[in-house]
């Protein structure tokens, strides 16, 4: 872990780019860093810095979520660039669970595509209210009516999924044009009046002006583990976004695993955010936590770090659930009691079995796409569950439902 200290002089937020494959998410992330770099607020990240895995470079798509850091005038930003390809939607869900603001990128040339629907539904289910819709590749379209039609179509989709339009911003622009302009002229004063630069500055200004809800700093500490790795000679580091509370160096915390046994107690011996050391991390921070006497093989993504004696693990619960229709990208056919899809809860995905189906308190044999029903679900293994927690249901590479936990069974 690094020796440089993290300076907390601006509000820290987590935001990210989502959307269909090849609509320009990574290009937009690159363009934002280029423009802020000219203004002295960010390191410049090239496309290759963000799509860093060998397979990503070969295929030209983002597979894993990538985190980069930059500052605006009022905020310190952790930017998560999420994959758009349907094969890697699991990684997108993990990235989206960390966001305060989602930037949904839509190509004006292609319009709304299958992953656009799915990503919107997922961020709604995760609970992200603040959304910036960036209609990209405007330079390739001279049909004003087409742009207006796509705006209308997006608006109708947001209303359909019950988004609060007071928290939605719809912008147009060209991320690639911004990059090309800056590569040719690195004097910000000479290019700041360019229409494409102005359009991207509008997006950055919206990020600056969005008010992030008060963090749950005074609650007990809770973090869902996103990743784990070892540092030779130091120990095991777990990463993730702190959901609530604070954590300090030398604090004792517990690891809640996927089994009903006594949690592992450990001590925090290092805290880091974007390669800078912290003495304290708080709700909303994306951190790496160095743990004492813990081996990498004993930690899995989706396990929970928490203040001791605050949480328990369960595997059975009741949930109010909506089953997506075929038109929404869901199942084409009903499912029965005994159906075993995947459940995505925080950063974990786990198989679960439908034990019972209820409609208006009456037991049903089947659930039909489009139904709003109550399900009794039993997971394959134990995880930390809390009331009112939201989750997604997936099968065969697509989202088929979404729900909220209303009762936890011992």
UniProtKB/Swiss-Prot annotation:
InterPro entries, per the entry: EF-Tu_GTPase, EFTu-like_2, EFTU_2, G_TR_CS, P-loop_NTPase, Small_GTP-bd, T_Tr_GTP-bd_dom, Transl_B-barrel_sf
Gene, per the UniProt record: tufA
Organism: Plasmodium falciparum (isolate 3D7)
Name this protein carries in UniProt: Elongation factor Tu, apicoplast
GO molecular function: GTP binding; GTPase activity; translation elongation factor activity
Annotated binding of Mg(2+), by residue: 26
Summary of the function given for this chain in its UniProt record: GTP hydrolase that promotes the GTP-dependent binding of aminoacyl-tRNA to the A-site of ribosomes during protein biosynthesis.
Record key words, sorted: Apicoplast, Elongation factor, GTP-binding, Hydrolase, Magnesium, Metal-binding, Nucleotide-binding, Plastid, Protein biosynthesis
Renumbered residue ranges of the record's region G4: 136-139
Single GO biological process annotation from the record: mitochondrial translational elongation
């Amino acid at each position: 872990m690094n020796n440089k200290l993290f300076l907390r002089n601006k509000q820290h937020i987590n935001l990210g780019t989502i959307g269909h494959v090849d609509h320009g998410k990574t290009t937009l992330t690159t363009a934002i860093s280029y423009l802020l770099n000219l203004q002295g607020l960010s390191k410049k990240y090239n496309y290759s810095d963000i799509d860093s895995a060998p397979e990503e470079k070969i295929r030209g798509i983002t597979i894993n979520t990538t985190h980069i850091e930059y500052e605006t005038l009022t905020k310190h930003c952790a930017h998560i660039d999420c994959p758009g390809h349907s094969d890697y939607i699991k990684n997108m869900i993990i990235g989206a669970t960390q966001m305060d603001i989602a930037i949904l990128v839509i190509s004006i040339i292609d319009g709304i595509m299958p992953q656009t629907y799915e990503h919107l539904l997922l961020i709604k289910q995760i609970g992200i209210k603040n959304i910036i819709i960036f209609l990209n590749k405007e330079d390739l379209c001279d049909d004003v009516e087409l742009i207006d039609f796509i705006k209308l179509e997006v608006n109708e989709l947001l209303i359909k999924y019950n988004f609060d339009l007071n928290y939605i911003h719809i912008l147009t622009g060209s991320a690639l044009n911004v990059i090309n302009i800056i590569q040719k002229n690195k004097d910000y004063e000479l290019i700041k009046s360019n229409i494409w630069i102005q359009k991207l500055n509008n997006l950055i200004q919206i990020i600056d002006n969005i008010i992030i809800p008060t963090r749950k700093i005074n609650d007990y500490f809770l973090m869902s583990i996103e990743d784990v790795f070892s540092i030779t000679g130091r120990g095991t580091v777990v990463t993730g976004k702190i959901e609530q509370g604070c954590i300090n160096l030398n604090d004792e915390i517990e690891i809640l695993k996927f089994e009903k046994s006594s949690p592992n107690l450990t001590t925090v011996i290092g805290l880091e955010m974007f390669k800078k050391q912290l003495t304290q991390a708080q709700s909303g921070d994306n951190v790496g936590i160095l743990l004492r006497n813990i081996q990498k093989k004993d930690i899995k993504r989706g396990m929970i770090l928490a203040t001791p004696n605050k949480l328990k693990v369960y595997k059975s619960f009741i949930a109010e659930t909506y089953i997506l229709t075929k038109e929404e990208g869901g199942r084409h056919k009903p499912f029965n009691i005994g159906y075993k899809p995947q459940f995505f809860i925080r950063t974990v995905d786990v198989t679960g079995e439908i034990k019972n189906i209820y409609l208006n308190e009456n037991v049903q044999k089947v659930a039909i796409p489009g139904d709003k029903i109550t399900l009794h679900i039993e997971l394959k293994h134990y995880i930390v569950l809390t009331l009112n927690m939201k989750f997604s249901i997936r099968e065969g590479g697509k989202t088929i439902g979404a729900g909220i936990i209303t009762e936890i069974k011992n």
